[in-house]
Amino acid sequence: MARTSSKTDSPKTGRLSGRFWKLLGASTDKDQARSMAQVHKAAEFDAKAADLDDEQLRKAARLLELDDLADSTDVPQFLAIAREAAKRTTGLTPFDVQLQGALRMLAGDVVEMATGEGKTLSGAIAAAGYALAGRNVHVITINDYLARRDAEWMGPLIEAMGLTIGWITADSTAAERRAAYRCDITYASVNEIGFDVLRDQLVTDVDDLVSPNPDVALIDEADSVLVDEALVPLVLAGTSHRETPRLELIRLVGELDENTDFATDNDSRNVHLTEAGARKIEAALGGIDLYSEEHVATTLTEVNVALHAHVLLQRDVHYIVRDDAVHLINSSRGRIATLQRWPDGLQAAVEAKEGIETTETGEVLDTITVQALINRYPRVCGMTGTALAAGEQLRQFYKLGVSPIPPNKPNIRQDETDRVYVTIAAKNDAVIEHIAEVHETGQPVLVGTRDVAESEEIHRRLVKAGVPAVVLNAKNDAEEAAVIAEAGKLGAVTVSTQMAGRGTDIRLGGSDEEDHDRVAELGGLHVIGTGRHHTERLDNQLRGRAGRQGDPGSSVFFSSWEDDLVMSHLEDNKLPLECDETGRVISPKAATLLEHAQRVAEGRLLDVHANTWRYNQLIAQQRAILVERRNTLLRTTTARDEIAELVPERYEEVKARLTAKDSETGEAKLETICRLIMLYHLDRAWADHLAFLADIRESIHLRALGRQNPLDEFHRMAVDAFASLAADAIEAAQQTFETAPSIEDEPGVDLSKLARPTSTWTYMVHDNPLADDTLSALSLPGVFR
């Protein structure tokens, strides 16, 4: 098997100059040298720490003066205590590079540490450092499994240093969440933290608040949370009586003929009706004009959404069907996007397409993007295996620097040059042949595919060829940790979508490392990618599964000119087609062209991120103003005071009835009534404002046809609408207080009409999801609760 290069870093990282790293926000050599000097000095205190009993070690940690982490002379002692505590509680002795990583996180950086280098332990030490400095720390993960696993694993270490630790999952009750947040360090997924922040915006009693004020966010898999999930808005929504999308329309669209009634573009990212298709729809609906003012924003939109669902959204690629329900697949992780759904019209169209009962629709009550959620924290830091490749986004959107941490042992993984084929069919044949060839030697193979359908097709062909293989994809993601842990066993062949199993180490010889030496002699884990991703960072994540902690390993990517990356970002007439008898492209330019396509794709994704951020930034600013007003109403007597000033006669009338028997109780009840009314109408006004913003965003791109700037127009309309929000809410509250009927035989007023919904879900809305070729609804799922 050909091996053309040895990498001691992720591909291309070794060629990045110090100046370029700085442009990406990387820490300077001076910063790194200072951190290493403190790590080396910590060794002087190791013996003293080892002589302390558990109680003495705990007291020593609590006596450290770490208020100013940048200048504290106690940092070396802290590192020595942390190393000793880790040794006693986890059986792991942190390497110097792990302590270096912890220090760079304490300096506010995102650290790049390769797979298997011990990020979890390094992050726990950094979290302990912040907590000992008096900060409240949220360790933010990508899912509930990792939040609980890491909290339970690192809990004894945290407690050995005199600190408290808690965790939150989707099953946690409100009381359990409050208890976890009261701890010095709280582990939770980004979704759960976001949901708690949103739900707190519906409480009407200060004692019902769950989420604390944000302080320190330490983010695991930082690139996934801060880049891949940055644009995902977590949305709190409530049940409503909005109309369900018309099923007759959805069924009608399903009967249309491709090419005759509708057409897709070359890369199958957009679909539109032909004239014949439009006439067929119009006739079926009684001769209407789809493009008339009456129908263009309603019926035509429904038709386009249904087309999108039927033609562009593919089962086992973008979603799976399980237990009579549609489950979305997270495009960057290759696993089920737990509790997620599309915007209602698209969700209903997909459900109808699959013959599944459509789920309930609703209205948005509040929303916050992951990016805005994280930017609430005064201090943000994190860790990942691929931070440098995300450096520009981290710097631009979070003002974060990146610190590359060297591996404890040199990375000796061999990365082969891409094998490029003219057609997908030729590529897939070559992939199967290559897997079989490597498997014959006993070397374990991990195959990374782009989607569920491809993983199952590769698995089917391997079984047919007599190669025993295990498939890991969104359909069996509950088993992923156990499956991926055995991917390094002798003779193992594991076919996996995207980054399934991320967060679980692949040890040579299997989880028990029984055949470690034998597998190492065979070359370690061999990673095969069945196509380049739209960002090099995801390629590097896949490659990084091999070569753990100085182990041997290898990787190779198979690509074709028919891959989505190439079709969307390269011109056909520039592709060399000369190939050998297997269909493999001979031209040495092939790999360079792939890299160019990837750079173009990355540029487009960055543009989309920046553009979406510009829309979301104003909404975030308006939300901050609303939250401040809401907190004032919730925590003070402002609601009562304003009502008393607005309607003094009615106020005194209600007050007299309430205080007739018990003055103190009556005053408290009156204050509660005023607060409930004010909060209800403020929340109602915000929900209406969000609905208005969603409506204008759906059509704002059309302003470009009139030579107007869509973003400027959106801002103008959003600012104008928000200007009257507070006054309108107060006026509505005044009217409610004046007109609310009295309760028979009881003092007070009837507030039964101010009932609040309880069902919540989240989803992502894009300006024009049916027309954007880089960020469509295919990759914009949301979370349903």
Curated annotation (Swiss-Prot):
Q: Give the main location.
A: membrane
Q: Name the reaction it catalyses.
A: ATP + H2O + cellular proteinSide 1 = ADP + phosphate + cellular proteinSide 2
Identify the InterPro entries for this entry. Helicase_ATP-bd, Helicase_C-like, P-loop_NTPase, SecA, SecA_Actinobact-type, SecA_CS, SecA_DEAD, SecA_motor_DEAD
SMART domains given in the database record: SecA_DEAD, SecA_PP_bind
- A GO BP annotation: intracellular protein transmembrane transport
Give its localization: Cell membrane; Cytoplasm
Q: Which Gene Ontology cellular component terms are annotated?
A: cell envelope Sec protein transport complex; cytosol; plasma membrane
Q: Which GO terms describe its molecular function?
A: ATP binding; protein-exporting ATPase activity
EC code(s) of this entry = 7.4.2.8
Its domain of life reads Bacteria
Membrane topology, as annotated, equals:
Peripheral membrane protein
* Residue positions binding ATP: Q98, G116, E117, G118, K119, T120, D505
What keywords does the record list, in alphabetical order? ATP-binding, Cell membrane, Cytoplasm, Membrane, Nucleotide-binding, Protein transport, Translocase, Translocation, Transport
What is the documented function of this protein?
Answer: Part of the Sec protein translocase complex. Interacts with the SecYEG preprotein conducting channel. Has a central role in coupling the hydrolysis of ATP to the transfer of proteins into and across the cell membrane, serving as an ATP-driven molecular motor driving the stepwise translocation of polypeptide chains across the membrane.
Q: Which HAMAP family match?
A: SecA
PANTHER family in the record, alphabetically?
A: CHLOROPLAST PROTEIN-TRANSPORTING ATPASE, SECA INNER MEMBRANE COMPONENT OF SEC PROTEIN SECRETION SYSTEM
Family from the record: Belongs to the SecA family.
Q: What is this protein called?
A: Protein translocase subunit SecA 3
